[in-house]
């Protein structure tokens, strides 16, 4: 089974880079460019994993996460948050949930792979 991953970032270059990399790893990729699209696509497609920028137009990734947690169909989707800001700066808005991780931009593909491999099983994904 191929993992379906939803990327949400308002920077189209970052989205394109992540999409290309994840497709090279045989994942199916969806993209969103703001918080509203993230919420809509997550509810519609129910991906195995969400990779979300913290600050996006429409709604912060962390705010959308809170909305997704209230929906029985999306509450178990693991989320990898990414941001140019440090974890220390964001610790008050990042959820304290074992199904989430955080990477500071620029992210390395090794760190990305590690987080994906940790998070996918937490949402029930079975390869």
Annotate each PLM feature.
Residues 61, 70, 84, 92-103:
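As written
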Residues 16-24:
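Charged docking surfaces used in two-component/phosphorelay signaling
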């Amino acid at each position: 089974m191929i993992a379906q991953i939803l990327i949400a970032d308002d920077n189209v270059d970052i989205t394109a880079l992540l999409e290309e990399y994840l497709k090279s790893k045989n994942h199916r990729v969806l993209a969103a460019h703001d918080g509203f699209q993230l919420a809509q696509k997550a509810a519609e497609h129910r991906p195995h994993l969400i990779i979300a920028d913290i600050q996006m137009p429409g709604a912060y990734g962390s705010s959308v996460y809170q909305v997704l947690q209230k929906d029985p169909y999306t509450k178990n989707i693991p989320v990898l948050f990414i941001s140019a800001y440090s974890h220390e700066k964001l610790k008050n808005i990042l959820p304290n949930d074992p199904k989430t991780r955080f990477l500071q931009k620029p992210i390395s593909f090794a760190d990305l792979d590690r987080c994906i491999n940790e998070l996918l099983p937490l949402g029930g994904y079975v390869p």
